[in-house]
């Protein structure tokens, strides 16, 4: 009995470690994306990221095939469209127009937005403290967007449009999560995530290829996919974004969440906005004004309040 209890404790410890590592890797996603965006446009960067993610999810695709009905395929394709091209193109076009620290703080509102969406669309109960947390998170986001320091010692400055694009990507992510939840009633989270990543990556390929082929018609300046002139730094950033920040985090989170209480594991989602904003300030020379710091504290405080009170926000289906 003692040995069994010790083994259970070790598994639980590893589960917390897996969730913490996933949250930490998620927190670096905007930083690596910013490095890659110095050498290519958003569409190319997101495509490369998910091509690397496909490599990381290959064992799941090869080892755990799923039989989807025609209706499930339609839901899957809609889920992939929301979850990959629409969400990430909006998010990183926003990052181009704002800073890593601002974008990271915005993402901190995700647990609260998810709880609100579950209450509105899925009939889950959100108590008075939950609604207060939602109001605090909304006020915090408004303070970051409208009251943040528009001056920075780095190369980028935050803008209202950039911050709003990041917020729009979070709303798109809510639609993706609610659709994914339906698929996960009959299929495991890793399988649904793998199929979503592969389907969404094919959509990104079609978008990039179609934009390039239609260049003579649209008269837009579309550059070919960069290869030879991409630096080693950018390739490393892209590989880390896809293999570690997307594929590995998904597998770590899905394993960890099944060995620890969901309400406790959810707190590790809050590592992402905190670490992301720190990386932006410390490594990229960005600055946050006093209102942005206060707004960020409200966002994180609201998220921690929800994720430590036992309210399950379905963190197993979150994809970064």
Where are the model-predicted features located?
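Juxtamembrane helix-loop boundary signature in multi-pass membrane transporters
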Residues: 1-21, 66, 109-171, 291, ...
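Juxtamembrane helix-entry segments on the extracytoplasmic side of multipass membrane proteins
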Residues: 11-16, 39-43, 47, 68-74, ...
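Transmembrane alpha-helices of multi-pass small-molecule transport proteins
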Residues: 14-15, 38-86, 113-117, 171-179, ...
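Cytoplasmic-side transmembrane-helix entry/capping segments in multi-pass membrane proteins
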Residues: 19, 71-80, 126-139, 187-196
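Transmembrane alpha-helical segments that form core, pore/gating elements
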Residues: 23, 31, 54-57, 114-116, ...
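Specific transmembrane alpha-helical segments of multi-pass solute transporters/efflux pumps
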Residues: 24-30, 58-107, 117, 143, ...
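Specific alpha-helical transmembrane segments that line the substrate/conduction pathway
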Residues: 44-55, 83, 88, 92-134, ...
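Helix-helix packing/entry segments at the starts of transmembrane helices
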Residues: 46-48, 102-110, 178-202, 238, ...
